[in-house]
Amino acid sequence: MCQVSMEQNMTETSAGQAVQQPPSQATIADLMRPPPTTIEPADHAAAAAYLMKHAGTTALVVLDAKTGQPVGIITEADITHAVADGKDPNEVRIHDLMTPDPTIINTTASIRDAAIIMTRGHFRHLPVTSDSGLVGMVEITDVCRALIGPFPFE
């Protein structure tokens, strides 16, 4: 569980960025991992696993091939469940596994807003947008680090 700390300190997120404002003032732009790794709905799950491994991420934003707009999100858990259910990752398509219409957060939103959205929706990842479109991804570990400070074992 994330607890909000109102102390001003410098926190390094897992994205390797320092958040220098108190958590109450920091925004998603201070925290997100740019650029997001994306995939299309018609691609295979094996391609998603490959991209995740090489990008060092556990989720991909699924973009509509024609509009370039986010239409879903696929996570390592989605692929793991499919394989455990006997589906061939070289055959099953992203559109069959993805969570459609993902909740998206804007770069100007607060870290607290992200924590609330992620907690209520049981999300580990949120695609991040700005006026120019999709610009990043924020993970629950980034939000927790920003709110509670560096973990003792780091």
What do these predicted regions represent?
Residues 1-154:
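Tandem CBS (Cystathionine beta-synthase) repeat/Bateman regulatory domains
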